[in-house]
Amino acid sequence: MRLLRILIITVAAALALPLAQASAAELLMYRRDGCPYCVAWDREVGPGYNNSSFGKVAPVRMVDVHGARPQVALKSPIIYTPTFVLVDEAREIGRIEGYSNNDFFYGTIARLIGQLPAAARSGLSASQ
């Protein structure tokens, strides 16, 4: 029984480790409570982003600027919210500071995803 408990704890710890680090391609959305632009993104983009071709390549993960942060090599500090940081293998590829509208967001994220290595972009259709 003790061995089983140790095995379960070990497996659970191994599964939780990737949550602490940004790996593969993902879009980190740094946000804070009370941010009106974060709320606008949540309303206009959030519901469909992870199901879009861009979201399949770089799913979004919410990061509270006042909470625990993933281990990512950022090019500069996070100052504004929202700030969207595209990362690949825990390294910043590029970012979008602020949110104005759906069209600007998707146009900019398309450009950023185009900077990913080809293997990371493999889920993106040629038409986007």
PLM regions with names:
Residues 10, 23-25, 39, 76-77, ...:
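Non-globular targeting/processing and membrane-anchoring segments
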